[in-house]
Amino acid sequence: MSRVVDLSPSEVEKLINDDVVMIDVRREDEFKHTGIIKNSHKMTFFDMFGNCDVPTWLSKFEKLVKSKDQLVVLICAHANRTRTIADFLIQNHGYTNIAHLEGGIANWLDEGRETVFN
């Protein structure tokens, strides 16, 4: 069985322009505060109350991800949500190449890496 791959900020930075789907699962208020990593897609998973419309989210996800083995990098604030979501995608939906940004966007910013606001 596949498992979630932890990627450091430097590893993620090297993937920015590759054929990798990067999905930021944070909320809009979080995007506004920190920005997002270049070329990542905003796809909020949990709302402020911890709720998620899973069918709608999965529909958007499946439009971005072309195959079950395509590399997907999930991003959140501190890598807590992304581990949960990655496990869900691997165990319940058969994805085999799911990674997440170790330490989340907080770690990315702590290392002085850039984000974009859009």
Where are these regions (language model features)?
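Short, surface-exposed ligand- or partner-binding patches at beta-edge/loop junctions that are enriched
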Residues: 74-76
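Rhodanese-like catalytic fold shared by cysteine-dependent sulfurtransferases
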Residues: 1-20, 28-71, 80-118
